[in-house]
């Protein structure tokens, strides 16, 4: 499996690489760690005109700092690849961060791992602008990392009977496996979560129950331990509650196809889950052969 890890040098970027090593993926991994240097984000503080005394010196110092950080990140990423026993390489590119990640992902990548936050030019933690762009513009699956890596023992799988959620189920069955764990002794437990709106239609409840039962049966045959969470309420909120209640290490959800404006649709439910989950989220777009 071709995996792209975006690492900006922040703790989230470093965690993303470690999460890839923790994922119970079946196929051998070929990992490319990407660090993007975006000199276009450089701005002199309080600059109100093109030339201000000291501006040139400041800009040169900032460029030097960016380059030094890139070198540091590349060396650290290489060392982490080796310590995690991952096969791959580290590359540095220049350009807009999100667009460069998307462009690189288009070259045969099957999974992108990105931190939910990162560092901007002033070393402030951004509110996910890069990860938000990536999940809406890459055509492959995306792992959004929110916390330090840990053994993956409990997964919440969001299902609704759509083609997108069926792809998420297939990803667990074909690309991941309960016998391919990297830490922890307990078997992986998948909570199949499905939420129905507050509508008094028995046929809807039966349909929801049928979806959960069908997915559960497939996962049981695949070797997972399975729990069920079929509830009434707002789907995104109920999935987030299930993740909290079942102490999920990871949420897995599907995504829709390509929209009319060239964005890969995530869907309102998956978007809200990615934005508000307490744990990392895997957004599945394609099932790896």
List each language-model region with its residue ranges.
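Small/aliphatic-rich secondary-structure junction motif
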Residues: 1-57, 84-86, 150-207, 213-229, ...
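Gly/Ser-rich helix-loop-strand patches that form or flank binding pockets
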Residues: 2, 17, 22, 26, ...
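Charged, low-complexity surface patches
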Residues: 70, 123, 208-209, 232, ...
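Structural beta-alpha unit
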Residues: 12, 22, 38-41, 57, ...
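Glycine- and acidic-residue-enriched helix-capping/strand-helix junction motifs
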Residues: 64-71, 201-209
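Short Asp/Glu-rich motifs
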Residues: 43, 100, 125, 154, ...
């Amino acid at each position: 499996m071709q995996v792209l890890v975006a690492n900006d040098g922040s703790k989230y970027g470093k965690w993303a690489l470690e999460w890839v090593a923790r994922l119970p993926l079946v196929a051998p991994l070929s990992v490319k760690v990407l660090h993007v240097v975006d000199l276009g984000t450089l701005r002199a503080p309080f600059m109100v005109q093109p030339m201000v005394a000291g501006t040139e010196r400041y800009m040169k110092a900032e460029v030097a700092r960016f380059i030094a950080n890139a070198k540091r990140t590349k060396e650290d990423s290489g060392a982490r690849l080796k310590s995690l026993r991952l096969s791959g390489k580290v590359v540095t590119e220049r350009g807009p961060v999100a667009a460069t990640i998307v462009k690189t992902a288009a070259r045969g990548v099957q999974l992108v791992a990105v931190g939910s936050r990162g560092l901007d030019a002033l070393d402030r933690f951004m509110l996910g602008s890069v990860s938000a762009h990536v999940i809406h513009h890459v055509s492959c699956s995306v792992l959004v990392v929110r916390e330090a890596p840990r053994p993956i023992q409990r997964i919440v799988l969001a299902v609704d009977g759509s083609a997108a959620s069926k792809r998420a189920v297939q990803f667990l069955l074909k690309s991941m496996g309960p016998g391919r764990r990297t830490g922890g002794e307990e078997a992986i437990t998948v909570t199949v979560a499905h939420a129905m709106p507050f509508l008094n239609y028995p046929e809807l409840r039966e349909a929801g129950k049928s979806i959960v039962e069908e997915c559960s049966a497939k996962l049981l045959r695949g070797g997972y331990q399975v729990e069920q969470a079929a509830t009434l309420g707002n789907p995104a909120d109920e999935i987030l509650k299930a993740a909290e209640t079942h102490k999920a290490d990871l949420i897995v959800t599907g995504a829709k196809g390509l929209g009319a404006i060239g964005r890969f649709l995530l869907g309102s439910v998956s978007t809200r889950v990615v934005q508000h989950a307490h744990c990392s989220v895997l957004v599945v777009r394609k099932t790896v052969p």
